[in-house]
């Protein structure tokens, strides 16, 4: 693989992020929603995208389950595969950001180190980690896919929160506690954060 890379040359793009900013009217960025299964990551991400779209923003959602149907269909749930899953998503998100898009990435992304590696791909203001905080007991009570039940019975191995760890972010840009707040209030928190930092228009 190393020898093959010697024959690969990076081709610089003609259009810049500044060009996209002038046209789109907003900064490109990644909203990285992380948390336990059942915490409400995807629900919140989709609701935020609806509001951003309504405001005229250019957006795209990268969702954990959807990605595993295609791009990452070759990966399982071992620690190594989970790390590779997040690495690939980070690279895909970077391509979208380079094209001026607001990316909403909803992934358990259980390992702190992996999230920080993704963060390192972006300029400081381009990566916003949103910790979707929800107690394990509440996530289990929701269990929309029946995964906790399978994990507790031993049918499903290496399930985050049961027999595989979730490493809580040390200093996320934003925390949304979905155990005690509505989706609407969560959306308002996210939008207020990006608006107050001048990343999207204030209207």
Swiss-Prot record:
GO terms for biological process: hydrogen sulfide biosynthetic process; sulfate assimilation. The active site is at 109 (phosphoserine intermediate). InterPro entries: APS_kinase (IPR002891), P-loop_NTPase (IPR027417). It comes from the Bacteria. Its EC number is 2.7.1.25. GO terms for molecular function: adenylylsulfate kinase activity; ATP binding. It is an enzyme of class 2 (transferase). It catalyses: adenosine 5'-phosphosulfate + ATP = 3'-phosphoadenylyl sulfate + ADP + H(+). Keywords: ATP-binding, Kinase, Nucleotide-binding, Phosphoprotein, Transferase. It holds the Pfam family APS_kinase. Pathway: Sulfur metabolism; hydrogen sulfide biosynthesis; sulfite from sulfate: step 2/3. ATP binds at residues 35-42. SUPFAM superfamilies: P-loop containing nucleoside triphosphate hydrolases. Gene3D superfamilies: P-loop containing nucleotide triphosphate hydrolases (3.40.50.300). Signal peptide: none annotated. PANTHER family: BIFUNCTIONAL 3'-PHOSPHOADENOSINE 5'-PHOSPHOSULFATE SYNTHASE, PAPS SYNTHETASE, ISOFORM D. HAMAP family: Adenylyl_sulf_kinase. Catalyzes the synthesis of activated sulfate. Belongs to the APS kinase family. NCBIfam families: apsK, PRK03846.1. This is Adenylyl-sulfate kinase. It comes from Geotalea daltonii (strain DSM 22248 / JCM 15807 / FRC-32) (Geobacter daltonii). The gene is cysC.
């Amino acid at each position: 693989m190393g020898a093959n890379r010697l024959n690969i040359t990076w081709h610089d793009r003609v259009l810049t992020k500044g060009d996209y900013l002038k046209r789109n009217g907003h900064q490109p960025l990644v909203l990285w929603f992380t948390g336990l299964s059942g915490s409400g990551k995807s629900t919140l991400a989709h609701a935020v995208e609806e509001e951003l779209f309504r405001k005229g923003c250019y957006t795209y959602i990268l969702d954990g389950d959807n990605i595993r149907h295609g791009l990452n269909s070759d990966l399982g749930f071992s620690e190594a595969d989970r790390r590779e899953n997040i690495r690939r998503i980070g690279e895909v998100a970077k391509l979208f950001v380079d094209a001026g898009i607001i990316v909403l990435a909803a992934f358990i992304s259980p390992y702190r180190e992996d999230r920080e590696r993704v963060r390192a791909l972006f300029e400081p203001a381009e990566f916003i980690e949103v910790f979707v905080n929800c107690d394990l007991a509440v996530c289990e009570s929701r269990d929309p896919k029946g995964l906790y039940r399978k994990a507790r019975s031993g049918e499903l191995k290496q399930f985050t929160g049961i027999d595989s760890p979730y490493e809580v972010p040390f200093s996320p840009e934003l925390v949304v506690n979905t155990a005690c707040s509505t989706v609407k209030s969560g959306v308002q928190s996210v939008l207020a954060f990006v608006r107050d930092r001048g990343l999207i228009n204030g209207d």
